[in-house]
């Protein structure tokens, strides 16, 4: 099964020592018209390879910073463009979960995402929100979110 790490956006609200995200002044997010082309390619592949599935892992930056409309549109394209192949599209998401809310959860659930990958580091200074790596602020947000 091909697995695609789909970097929906370069934007991220965290500042973690181990991350390879480059914090740009103007981070890019995939345009919705290009997202449509991606789903057309997914469908073409799945039609050509009827025994295959595609796993798509929404990643980033922070995937939630791409905005809820991106995922609503992806869900729409899954239903419309991939109508006959959608059962072989498997989605996952890797997030720092600090921006997760019920709207994201509802859309992700409809996409078949039932587990959200994240990492948690209790060691101070490894992870933080904003430019300063303040783990206390991050951990507070992390636990309030859930």
Task: Please state what every model-predicted region is.
Residues 3-33:
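Canonical Radical SAM [4Fe-4S] cluster-binding loop centered on the CxxxCxxC motif
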Residues 1-5, 48-51:
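N-terminal [4Fe-4S]-dependent radical SAM core
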Residues 39, 43-44, 48-57, 66-146:
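Radical SAM/AdoMet-radical enzyme domain recognition
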Residues 61-62:
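Active-site neighborhood of divalent metal-dependent phosphoester/pyrophosphate hydrolases
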Residues 12, 16, 58, 93:
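Conserved, mostly hydrophobic/aromatic
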